[in-house]
Curated annotation (Swiss-Prot):
Function: Covalently attaches a chromophore to Cys residue(s) of phycobiliproteins.
Family as reported in the entry's similarity comment: Belongs to the CpcT/CpeT biliprotein lyase family.
Organism from which the protein derives: Gloeobacter violaceus (strain ATCC 29082 / PCC 7421)
Protein name: Chromophore lyase CpcT/CpeT 2
Lineage, uppermost ranks: Bacteria, Bacillati, Cyanobacteriota, Cyanophyceae, Gloeobacterales
Keywords: Lyase
UniProt xrefs under InterPro entries: CpcT/CpeT, CpcT/CpeT_sf
C-alpha cells in the first residue's frame, strides 16, 4: 500500500508548470520555460510514474527535454525519483498535454532506458519535499566539450516546483554549465493530481 507521503509527492509534481513571473522579473537571467509532468498508467511501472516534458514557452509543442520518472518509497522514508530516457522520443512529443493521455497508455518499460546515476532522493520537510541527485557523480552529461556530472536540487510544494541544475567538472567540481542566478521557480498552472488519485491499480 502506498504511503501518504509518496502519494502527496506524486500529486504535487503532477501538473503543468511555468516560471512566467520569474522570467518577466529577470529576463536576463531566466528564460520563460514550461514544465509539464503527467501521470502515467499504473501498469508502466506497476507503481507511480510521470511523463515529463520541458520546453521554451514560445515553442512549448517541441520540448527539448523529455524524461520518464518512477517514484518509489524506501523503508527509511526516502522517496527515490528514478529517471528514464525514452529510446525514441518522436512518438510521444507533446503527449504530456493531451487531454485523454492516449499515447501515454501505449508506453511500455521496453521503450525506456534507465539512468541510474540520475535518481533524485526526496525527503519530506514539513510542508515541502526537498530532493537532490544521488551523490557519487553518477549522472554524467557531456556538454561544452567536457565530461561533467549533474549537481541537481529540487523543492516541491503543493503549488510550486523549484529546481536548479548545475554541471560540474568530474575532477575539479568547478561549475561548467547551469544556472548561476539561483533556482528556476515554477508555479503550477494546471493540476493533474486528480489523475494520480484516480490511477487504476491491479
Amino acid at each position: 500500500m502506498s504511503s501518504h507521503n509518496l502519494v502527496t509527492l506524486v500529486s504535487w509534481l503532477a501538473g503543468d508548470f511555468s516560471n512566467r513571473e520569474q522570467a518577466w522579473d529577470a529576463p536576463a537571467f531566466f528564460s520563460h520555460i514550461r514544465l509539464c509532468m503527467r501521470p502515467l498508467p499504473w501498469q508502466v511501472f506497476e507503481g507511480y510514474g510521470l511523463y515529463s516534458e520541458q520546453a521554451d514557452d514560445y515553442d512549448w509543442a517541441h520540448p527539448y527535454r523529455i524524461v520518464v520518472l518512477n517514484l518509489v518509497e524506501q523503508p527509511d522514508g526516502i522517496i527515490e525519483c528514478r529517471n528514464y530516457a525514452l529510446k525514441d522520443t518522436a512518438p510521444y512529443l507533446g503527449a504530456a498535454r493531451e487531454a485523454e493521455r492516449a499515447r501515454l497508455h501505449r508506453l511500455t518499460p521496453e521503450q525506456l532506458e534507465p539512468l541510474p546515476g540520475c535518481t533524485f532522493l526526496f525527503k519530506r520537510e514539513g510542508s515541502l519535499f526537498r530532493g537532490r541527485v544521488r551523490p557519487g557523480k553518477g549522472c554524467r552529461v557531456f556538454r561544452k566539450g567536457r565530461d561533467t556530472y549533474l549537481d541537481g536540487e529540487a523543492t516541491v510544494s503543493a503549488d510550486y516546483y523549484k529546481s536548479i541544475d548545475r554541471g560540474r567538472d568530474l575532477e575539479s567540481d568547478e561549475q561548467v554549465w547551469g544556472s548561476v542566478s539561483g533556482p528556476f521557480h515554477f508555479t503550477k498552472q494546471v493540476d493533474f493530481a486528480p489523475e494520480v488519485l484516480a490511477l487504476a491499480r491491479p
